Amino acid sequence: MSSKSSLNLFSEKKFSQFGEDGIIREILNRINSKNLDKWCVEFGASDGILYSNTYNLIKNHNYQAVLIEADKKSFSKLNKNIDTKKVIKLNKFVKFDGENSLEQILKKTEIPKNFDLISIDIDGCDYYIMENLK
């Protein structure tokens, strides 16, 4: 892989934990983000800002979002931190299937089916959720 194509070169920490802000922007640029709907989803959203992979998009790039957080204390902070009509905030525990599957949760929102980015940060269950996405 040439150094020009390495995404690590674009690492930039604005709100993310390990520079994902810059890497995500570069990926969106490479896929021509001007043609995207500008919607993202983050579950395991915590307080909505600290180590968020979507907050930079919401704050600085006019994205709309669905932010999902299961923990009541973190969700309370998220509610205080994110005060915009561009964001749908949900206090839900995402499950593999049934009423609280990601698919069913998102069906109840106005997010388009072809949203642009999903960020999953649920401490060890990320793989199992991705495996069950439809």
Where are these regions (language model features)?
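Short helix-to-loop capping/linker segments positioned immediately adjacent to catalytic or ligand/cofactor-binding
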Residues: 115-117, 129-130
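Non-catalytic N-terminal targeting/anchoring module and adjacent flexible stem/linker
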Residues: 1-9
